[in-house]
Amino acid sequence: MQYINIVNEGVKQLHPYQAGKPIEELERELGITNIIKLASNENPFGLPDSAKQAILAELDNLTRYPDSNGFYFKQTVAKKFGLSPEQITLGNGSNDLLELVAHTFANEQDEILFSQYAFIVYPLVTQAINAKKVEIPAKNYGADLDGFLQAISDKTKLIYLANPNNPTGTFLSAGEISQFLNQVPAHVIVVLDEAYTEFTLPEERVDSFTLLKKHSNLVICRTLSKAYGLAGLRIGYAVSSAEIADLFNRVRQPFNCNSLALAAATAVLHDDAFIAKVAENNRQGLKLLEDFFTAKGLNYIPSKGNFVMLDVNQPALPIYQALLQKGVIVRPIAGYGLPNHLRISIGLPEENQRFLLALNEVLGL
């Protein structure tokens, strides 16, 4: 029996996600030590103490199922951002929520719109449910909002829009997003993916939650994997109208967030000092890399995230491999249609310096 012949039609075109090898295995294979990973946009500071303490306090409760509704976590999010708990949906990371939106609203052959050079999960989710992918050509490596508006049809059900965008780091202002939402028909759900919003400068940051008061078709997805340092625990949340959140909770798996994730996330949302430290390290590190690229005449896309996309002006895979031999892992992004580019996550100061030294040697600058 060839089981591929009986699966959902969309699944036939998919391939399993290819994760990188563990650092320990790479060190063994390459015969080197002290590899640094600047590939996955993770928090270089590791787990904050506030989260560690919350996890330790929760250990004795692990024989019980987690709180399926995330009562204390939702209360914390609601208080922090001036929301109602009924507007919040729990996710096993924001990827879970991006998929949940599609399963809730889209049917086969509905159209789902997303930008060229946008997060690879958007087309994967669309393909998996056998909906129709509509990729909008990018404008200066970012979302062309006019292009989105022109592409909307009666069959359009969802729009995925990242701000800042991964992997390019481009950014849409509050005015641009507001004007765009004013022109999107009510039957189209707009998913605003804000996985990297904490890295934007406070004076530039979009207060997206206020947009919900006017736009009931808006869903905002956030994660605690990036700035908050909880990538291994898998927790995120969506904010929407209470009506849409109720629909999500009809589809969402119960207990999709484990007890340790809920405890750690609740604690770190109170940890403003940690987030301030993370944001300042990112600001300085991003400036260091971008100043270096400018001084060396290298092309890059100015970023508002915790990463920067570099054009090495040649196939990037050999550059990636040469950097790996020097103990520095970055991300080649040919899978996004950018074969000459690398995405580099911002690390600790000493990691950023080590990357620049390795890049200087590899490129012969």
UniProtKB/Swiss-Prot annotation:
Modified residues (N6-(pyridoxal phosphate)lysine): K226
Pathway: Amino-acid biosynthesis; L-histidine biosynthesis; L-histidine from 5-phospho-alpha-D-ribose 1-diphosphate: step 7/9
Gene3D superfamilies: Aspartate Aminotransferase, domain 1 (3.90.1150.10), Type I PLP-dependent aspartate aminotransferase-like (Major domain) (3.40.640.10)
GO biological-process terms attached to the record: L-histidine biosynthetic process
Keyword entries, A-Z: Amino-acid biosynthesis, Aminotransferase, Histidine biosynthesis, Pyridoxal phosphate, Transferase
Entry cofactors: pyridoxal 5'-phosphate
Entry keyword Transport: no
GO molecular function: histidinol-phosphate transaminase activity; pyridoxal phosphate binding
EC number: 2.6.1.9
Recorded catalytic activity of this chain's protein: L-histidinol phosphate + 2-oxoglutarate = 3-(imidazol-4-yl)-2-oxopropyl phosphate + L-glutamate
One Pfam family hit: Aminotran_1_2
Amino-acid biosynthesis among keywords: yes
PANTHER family (alphabetical): HISTIDINOL-PHOSPHATE AMINOTRANSFERASE, HISTIDINOL-PHOSPHATE AMINOTRANSFERASE 2
SUBUNIT field: Homodimer.
Similarity section: Belongs to the class-II pyridoxal-phosphate-dependent aminotransferase family. Histidinol-phosphate aminotransferase subfamily.
Listed name of the protein: Histidinol-phosphate aminotransferase 2
